[in-house]
Amino acid sequence: MMQQLLADGVKWVDLRLAFIFFYYAEGKEEPEANYERMFKVFGEEIEKFKASEEGKDFWGARMIWTGIRVLDTRKIVEDMDACIGIKLAYPHLISGYDLVGQEDGGRPLKDLLPELFWFKKQCAEEGIDIPFFFHAGECLGDGSDTDQNLFDAVLLGTRRIGHGFSLYKHPLLIDMVKDKKILVESCPISNEVLRLCASVMSHPLPALLARGVSCSLCNDDPAILGQDTAGMTHDFWQALQGWDNLGLAGLGSLAENSVRWAAFEDQNAAKWVHDIKEATLGNGVRAEKMKQWSVEWEQFCLWVVTEFGDDGESIRKLGKETSLDAQD
């Protein structure tokens, strides 16, 4: 997976994984009692790849622990408890917590408030902070429980919103998202496949961008939805082809946002927002990675101009000549 990501230009990944499977250690016929061994291997493989010649440019990966929203209270609490246990054992590998599954077929966030408050209380007692990165608003409704997940996600302090498809319908909420520096993780191909929109042309992301909402592109279950690779090329290509106002500069802004809002390290809410506001002017890991990205972006733009500049000039000249001929 890391090989595929790096080959596609992705240097950092915040993975989401639902822990509803048994993990078997190599050569063992009985599953592990918990996921500690899996995370041990996960961390070792990341460092092994980064130390290799092939992976020397890879920044790393962390995991957003993902629960299933349709489960009952006991199972969700047990899953949350397992998340806390792994965070205590491998704090550098767990970056946040989310609840996934079909939103309108599962429990809304307002129904899960007791479990979420219990989770936060347990984290505080253990002296750890596991922020929320909620899926919310992945729906067509307006005022439904699923749509209102957006409001609850913001009130619960989510740092990013997965999908946020229905956000464009709520001007006041848009202003809150902007004020709180919350990123919207948009997944165009997923939204098409799941029939939230007929094509990328009718996707609401351009409306959010026009209102100044910070957004990024994400792939959302590529192995299930048909991309069949871990990279981002398919979603970026869809966006480039579908939205004329976006262009190369717009794609660059979306990519930069994915670096700006990445969960590189544990930070409290105030430090998280401060570093996002500071961007490249800061002095932490986020600023360092954004500076690296900016250098590579400038190099990429230079390559585009060098490789295709003459062709572009020829096309512009041809367009002017055609226009003059038409006037004559």
Segments predicted by a language model, with ranges:
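Histidine/acidic-residue-rich catalytic or RNA/ligand-binding cores of hydrolases
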Residues: L109-D111, L140-V154, P171-K178, L194-L205, ...
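Conserved, mostly hydrophobic/aromatic
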Residues: G9, Y97, H135, A153, ...
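Glycine-enriched alpha-helix->loop->beta-strand junction motifs that scaffold or abut catalytic
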Residues: I94, D152-R160, K178-E185, G212-S214
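Mid-to-C-terminal alpha-helical segments outside catalytic/metal-binding sites
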Residues: D244-D328
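Acidic, glycine-rich loop-and-beta core segments that form the ion-binding/anion-interacting portion
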Residues: I84-G85, A89-L156
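Catalytic beta/alpha-barrel core
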Residues: I68, D98-G101, R159-K169, V193
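Alpha-helical scaffold segments that flank or form the walls of functional sites
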Residues: M1-R16, F22-Y24, K40-E47
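Short acidic/histidine-rich active-site segments
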Residues: L99, P131-G141, H163, R211-G231
